[in-house]
Curated annotation (Swiss-Prot):
UniProt superkingdom: Bacteria
Organism whose genome encodes this protein: Polynucleobacter asymbioticus (strain DSM 18221 / CIP 109841 / QLW-P1DMWA-1) (Polynucleobacter necessarius subsp. asymbioticus)
Enzyme class: transferase
Gene that encodes the chain: ribH
Annotated Gene Ontology cellular component terms: cytosol; riboflavin synthase complex
Family: Belongs to the DMRL synthase family.
Entry annotation: catalytic residues: H96 (proton donor)
Listed EC numbers: 2.5.1.78
Binding site for 5-amino-6-(D-ribitylamino)uracil: F30, A64, L65, E66, A88, V89, I90, N121
The name this protein goes by in its record: 6,7-dimethyl-8-ribityllumazine synthase
Pfam families named in the record: DMRL_synthase (PF00885)
Molecular functions per Gene Ontology: 6,7-dimethyl-8-ribityllumazine synthase activity
Function: Catalyzes the formation of 6,7-dimethyl-8-ribityllumazine by condensation of 5-amino-6-(D-ribitylamino)uracil with 3,4-dihydroxy-2-butanone 4-phosphate. This is the penultimate step in the biosynthesis of riboflavin.
Keywords: Riboflavin biosynthesis, Transferase
Taxonomy of the source species: Bacteria, Pseudomonadati, Pseudomonadota, Betaproteobacteria, Burkholderiales
Length: 170
């Protein structure tokens, strides 16, 4: 009989309950048709997971390279449990596609690590409009699930210093 590691250690299970979570979304407007579809799918799934409409804030920016700046500003407010980055970068005839894709992803990751705030990266990088159209609904919903799960994980792994500091004090 084999045992998995789960038999011997405490496991934090994925928590997709969005109740009481505050989620910020930064959506690029470049390739707007795809970006609006991404945000619509994301918001629809957030609502289905229990995040209230009042607890969702949507900010739009010109393009994918502007997403990290807006994420950083939202993270700095301390008002959010998680953030979502949404955009669509579609290959053209120049090297610009690689630059935008790589720099946007690096900036999103850096903001998440530096702020300690989970950020679901839903910036599509596709070869064609058709590829983007096929992916937007699933990617938007996946980002909603990812940000809710990671926000709950972050909350579960964050010590409650007030309780520890004030324990035993009257």
């Amino acid at each position: 009989m084999t045992n998995s590691n789960n038999d011997f250690v405490g496991v934090l299970e994925a928590d997709l309950n969005g109740q009481d979570l505050r989620i910020g979304i930064v959506q690029a407007r470049f390739n707007e048709e795809h970006c609006v579809a991404l945000s619509t799918a994301c918001i629809t799934e957030l609502l289905a997971l229990g995040v209230t409409q009042a607890d969702i804030k949507l900010v739009t920016v010109p393009g994918a390279l502007e997403i990290p700046f807006a994420l950083q500003k939202l993270a700095a407010t301390g008002e959010f449990d998680g953030l979502v980055a949404l955009g669509a970068v579609i290959r053209g005839e120049t090297y610009h596609f690689e630059l935008v894709s790589n720099e946007s992803a690096a900036g999103i990751t850096r903001i998440s690590i530096d702020s300690g705030l989970p950020i679901a990266n839903g910036v599509l990088t596709c070869e064609t409009d058709e590829q983007a159209s096929v992916r937007v609904n699933l990617k938007g919903a996946d980002c909603a699930k990812a940000v809710v799960e990671m926000a709950n994980l972050a909350l579960a792994l964050t010590p409650d210093f007030d309780i520890e500091v004030n324990a035993g004090e009257e």
